[in-house]
Amino acid sequence: MSLRILTNIYLTKDEGGIKQMKVLLLFSSADIGGAERSLSRMALSNDDDAVSYQLSTFGSYGVWSEWVASAGGVPICFDKRVWKLLKYIFTEKPDAIYIIGFRLAVLLRVITPFISKSFLVQGVRWNPNSNSMLDKTFRFVEWLFGSLLDGYIVNSNSARLNLNKLVKKNIELIYNGIADIQPINSKKSDNKNIIITIANLSVRKGYEDYLRAIAIVVNKVPESRFLFLGKDNLDGKIQQLIIDNNLENSVQYLGFQEKIDEFLENSAVFVLPSLYGEGCPTSILEAFSFSLPVVAYQIDGIPELVTHGVDGLLFDVGDVNALADGIINLLLDPEKSTKMGISGYQKVKDYFLLNDMVKKHNDYFLRLK
């Protein structure tokens, strides 16, 4: 699919008397995670003249901006300067501001009405149902000030149900989508011992528990090899735990990788050990697109993607022994693993394509006009 190259200045078109809907897609972070990847791909893949997306970050030029530029986009960076952001909104007058980031959404819902008539839409890319301070604050603020937004877009039904308890606004459910579905890899059996995880290193991603499970797996399947891909937000803690648990020969941390296809192509099983705070993980859909079975905890939006025993294995959160047994089961039964991977592959083809994600976003924003 050809990419629409976006510029810093919106192109306003009147086709058939209909003015183009201009959407400022604004990320609070300059880093790149599942939300940044999936929504940026959505915006870059849009070819509907009725809607245009300007990609931007409240942060500075960095990993995400470079990634967008490499894909043909022209991102705007506001360098954490509120005045720069407000000046842009006042000058360019986007029809809608699609905000990804809770704190930034709070700020804009207070200030923006004084300078702009832009619709304010908050993207909630996780299920805010945990006891973390962030989630508690989120629930309180949305209950109190949710009326100042024009709407929400969530990417999991679990998030929609929880948000529905707090606000009366219309909440739109749009799952993530994948653009390129790879042909089924007939050589997966050659990579039967490689287990991959794509997730930034953070507390909620559950890497500490995962290392305990890995120690059990390695004891039963010594030839197994584990790959960790993602930005380190724990200042080397996980790398030190790998050393402390004598897992250096079994676990390799590769940091953030802009291109992940080759790693997925050469893996047999995908594991996402998140403990809480998931919506519709893009990494799971990417794993399915490469015919990988998924092993994860049964939390938040993950069961909406993974069907236990069909295209993956789901376990109670924190059950390290069960997580380890699930991985071992797939490593020792490659036929079962392959069958599950093919089921996941078919699920993505049927229900989680990027074109559908783009269309649903466009339809939503056009309804705001």
Regions found by a protein language model. Give the residues of each.
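N-terminal strand-loop element at the rim of the active site
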Residues: 25-83, 162-164, 173, 232-235
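A conserved mid-protein helix/loop that constitutes part of the nucleotide-sugar donor-binding site
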Residues: 33-44, 193, 200-216, 233-239, ...
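Short His-centered aromatic/hydrophobic patch
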Residues: 99-107, 124
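Carbohydrate-associated surface elements
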Residues: 158, 177
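Active-site donor-binding acidic/aromatic loop of nucleotide-activated sugar
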Residues: 234-237, 248-257, 263, 313-314
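Acidic donor-binding loop of glycosyltransferase active sites
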Residues: 265-279, 292
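Short hydrophobic beta-strand element within catalytic cores of glycosyltransferases
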Residues: 293-296, 306
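Conserved acidic donor-binding segment of nucleotide-sugar-dependent glycosyltransferases
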Residues: 308-309, 313-320, 329-334
